[in-house]
From Swiss-Prot:
GO terms for cellular component: virion component. The keyword DNA-binding applies. Residues 50-73 are annotated as: Disordered. GO terms for biological process: symbiont-mediated suppression of host innate immune response; viral protein processing. It holds the Pfam family Pox_F17. It comes from the Viruses. InterPro entries: Phosphoprotein_F17. Residues 56-68 have a biased composition (Basic and acidic residues). The gene is OPG062. Self-associates to form high molecular-weight forms. Interacts with protein OPG157. Interacts with host RICTOR and RPTOR; these interactions disrupt the mTORC1 and mTORC2 crosstalk. Plays an essential role in virion assembly and morphogenesis. Also plays a role in the inhibition of host immune response by dysregulating mTOR. Sequesters host RICTOR and RPTOR, thereby disrupting mTORC1 and mTORC2 crosstalk. In turn, blocks the host antiviral response in part through mTOR-dependent degradation of cGAS, the primary poxvirus sensor. It is found in: Virion. This is Phosphoprotein OPG062. Belongs to the orthopoxvirus OPG062 family.
Amino acid sequence: MNSHFVSAHTPFYINTKEGRYLVLKAVKVCDVRTVECEGSKASCVLKVDKPSSPTCERRPSSPSRCERMNNPGKQVPFMRTDMLQNMFAANRDNVTSRLLN
């Protein structure tokens, strides 16, 4: 089986039951077979335990999107670092080279 790995467009958010996650780097995997499995019929089921970190459990929930939009004066500052700046520059260069080719 031949697999192809392609860099996905980043950054982006993923909304889950546990909260909202910012994805800074992602890899898109192509031509990989998906196996359907039902837990009740499977002979082996992967169990994932949630971390028991007290800082995660005590963290206050973030305000809803409506609350954020009602307070336009309170914008969250963007932390500028060389790592993020280089990542965005590389992404911009990749998009530019794709458009020109």
